[in-house]
């Protein structure tokens, strides 16, 4: 807002009522002890209630000051001292009321530092007046000029408090010069105060300043008139102590920043309050900083909470959000190890079903093979997670993410065929606190303890584990595409493995290794290992059919079939004539030949 030119430039235009937080409560009580009682004449019942409420809040504000918060922003700027100045002229008291109420709208009250400037403030009136023309750097500004500047400075919270901090001293200084100050300009000033004083926009207000605003507008009219000398005396020792500490530190900052006290220095007493106000000015940004830091700290806490919420989501969230498991393993996995075994088994079954491998082999062998393998996986990951735990819980989530990414890479390497399900299944168990893991697991292997003991070996171990499981995998990998044909033809994996153990060298006879394997399956495995369905009849029924004609015919068909279908061995992995050999006893040869012709297997 533009500065008001209605105000006379002289400091005389500024009424005595402007004793603010910068003016010490002690000095106001000493100078205005006689006049303070008359201030109660202006008070309504509501204002008195506001006074009591303010006095209650003082303790909390002082506690904030002790905690390191800036008290500049937490208390109303125009303290009762201003009204104690009022009674000098009967007109000024009512005039002071609206001014005080208007000024209270500005959110930066700093009564606690008033004690510092308590002694000197009355003398510096000439210096203050001379400095009042300058911008808020000259901390001793007249109320009228402060109001102008506050209008321009409402954009920033820090400047507005500076203005009001300065004013009270002037009020005190003008207490000495009360005769000089005519009430008429103050009357003129009051309407301008009503128009000029505007609180800064919310974007520029601090949280504490907003609280102060909420407290101040009701409080201050009562507050300024109400506060008895006793209350002021009560506050003053606290404010003096805090002001002394803040003034020492803040004056150094102010001198470093090179605050220009200009015309105010010719008299040393004004310079001291100027330093105090300077201390208050730098303290305002410093006060803003703790609020910002606290808001950041409080913001980081909710950032830690969402992982707790995510932990209870689906198991796949570990790979998408690995830091959730690592950082919050304790919470999610109290019940994890018991359920993880079941979930692991379920996942392994699903993986085997997808691979087309029968589950019969899982039940006898996997508790030995794959559980040990999964424990190796879990041991590796548990050790990596145990390393991750030590930094992860005290450290920032970045460390958690880093360790999580390591564990994620390890699990991704392991996640081949059913092992992916294993890694998912064991992640909660591995990340339970090691003590809980050992107790909760139904499996007897004490790996989590080893993870603590061998935490130094963690990085070296995962490689042999990976190689061990990958070494066991290649056999499974060779069977992956074959398992599709096995699933179609119904041949069991266990029967194939038993046949492979008996005759390991026969698999590599042909290029793809398909037909010899399936011939072997059709002959030794298919007939011997699987119980024969009753619907097909007994094997003896097929022995003497047609005097062996069918056998010769079928052999001829087998010899003709490659030429007939061309690339049948390359394209079709299933062995020739397997379906033809199975024929019930009573079917005549004619029907059989017709069926073979329809199938294209019999060539005339």
From Swiss-Prot:
Residue numbers of Phosphoserine PTMs: 132, 134, 396, 411, 522
InterPro entries the record matches: SARG
Basic and acidic residues compositional bias, start-end: 208-259, 343-353
Compositional bias (Polar residues): 68-93, 143-158, 311-330, 556-566
Biased composition, class Low complexity, residue ranges: 20-39, 117-132, 380-411
Cellular component terms (Gene Ontology): cytoplasm
UniProt-annotated stretches for the region Disordered: 20-41, 64-411, 424-484, 497-541, 553-592
Assigned keywords, A-Z: Cytoplasm, Phosphoprotein, Receptor
Domain of life, per lineage: Eukaryota
Residue numbers carrying Phosphothreonine: 333
Subcellular locations according to the entry: Cytoplasm
Protein family: Belongs to the SARG family.
UniProt function note: Putative androgen-specific receptor.
PANTHER family: SPECIFICALLY ANDROGEN-REGULATED GENE PROTEIN
Protein name: Specifically androgen-regulated gene protein
Organism, as annotated: Rattus norvegicus
């Amino acid at each position: 807002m533009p500065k008001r030119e209605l105000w006379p430039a002289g400091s005389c235009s500024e009424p005595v009522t402007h004793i603010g937080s910068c003016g010490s409560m002690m000095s106001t009580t000493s100078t205005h002890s006689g006049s303070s009682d008359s201030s109660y004449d202006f008070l309504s019942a509501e204002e008195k209630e506001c006074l009591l409420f303010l006095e209650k809040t003082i303790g909390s504000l002082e506690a904030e000051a002790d905690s390191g918060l800036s008290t500049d922003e937490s208390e109303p700027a125009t303290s009762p001292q201003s009204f104690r100045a009022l009674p000098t002229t009967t007109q000024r008291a009512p005039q002071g009321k609206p001014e005080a109420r208007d000024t209270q709208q500005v959110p930066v009250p700093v009564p606690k530092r008033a004690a510092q400037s308590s002694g000197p403030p009355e003398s510096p009136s000439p210096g203050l007046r001379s400095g009042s023309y300058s911008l808020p750097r000259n901390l001793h500004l007249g109320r009228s000029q402060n109001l102008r500047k506050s209008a321009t400075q409402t954009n920033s919270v820090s400047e507005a408090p500076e203005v009001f901090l300065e004013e009270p001293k002037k009020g005190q200084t003008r207490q000495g010069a009360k005769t000089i100050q005519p009430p008429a300009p103050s009357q003129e000033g009051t309407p301008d105060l009503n128009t000029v004083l505007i609180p800064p926009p919310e974007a520029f207000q601090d949280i504490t300043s907003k609280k102060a605003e909420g407290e101040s507008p009701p409080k201050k009219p009562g507050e300024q008139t109400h506060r008895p000398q006793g209350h002021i005396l009560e506050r003053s020792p606290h404010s003096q102590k805090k002001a002394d500490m803040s003034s020492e530190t803040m004056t150094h900052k102010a001198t470093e920043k090179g605050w220009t006290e200009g015309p105010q220095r010719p008299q040393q007493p004004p310079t001291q309050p100027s330093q105090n106000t300077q201390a208050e000015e730098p303290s305002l940004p410093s006060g803003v900083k703790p609020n910002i830091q606290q808001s950041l700290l409080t913001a980081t806490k909710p950032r830690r909470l969402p992982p707790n919420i995510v932990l209870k989501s689906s198991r796949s969230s570990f790979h998408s959000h690995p830091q959730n498991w690592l950082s919050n393993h304790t919470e999610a996995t109290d019940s994890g190890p018991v359920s993880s075994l079941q979930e692991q088994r379920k996942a392994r079954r699903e993986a085997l079903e997808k691979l087309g491998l029968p589950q019969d082999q899982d039940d006898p062998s996997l508790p030995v093979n794959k559980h040990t393998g999964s424990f190796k996986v879990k041991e590796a990951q548990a050790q990596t997670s145990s390393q991750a735990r030590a930094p992860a819980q005290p450290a920032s989530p970045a460390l958690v993410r880093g360790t999580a990414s390591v564990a994620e890479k390890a699990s991704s390497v392991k996640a081949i065929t059913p092992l992916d399900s294993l890694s998912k299944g064991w992640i909660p168990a591995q990340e339970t606190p090691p003590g809980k893991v050992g107790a909760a697991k139904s499996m007897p292997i004490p790996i989590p303890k080893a993870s603590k003991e061998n935490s130094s070996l963690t990085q070296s171990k995962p490689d042999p584990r990976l190689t061990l499981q990958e070494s066991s995998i290649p056999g499974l990998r060779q069977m992956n595409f074959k398992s599709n044909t096995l699933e179609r033809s119904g041949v069991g994996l266990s029967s194939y493995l038993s046949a492979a153990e008996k005759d390991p060298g026969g698999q590599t006879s042909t290029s793809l290794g398909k037909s010899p394997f399936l011939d072997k399956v059709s002959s030794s495995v298919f007939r011997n290992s699987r119980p024969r369905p009753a619907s097909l009849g007994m094997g003896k029924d097929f022995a003497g059919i047609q005097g062996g004609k069918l056998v010769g015919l079928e052999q001829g068909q087998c010899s003709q079939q490659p030429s007939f279908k061309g690339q049948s061995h390359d394209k079709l992995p299933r062995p020739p004539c397997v379906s033809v050999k199975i024929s019930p006893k009573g079917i005549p040869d004619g029907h059989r030949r017709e069926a073979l012709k329809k199938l294209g297997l019999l060539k005339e």
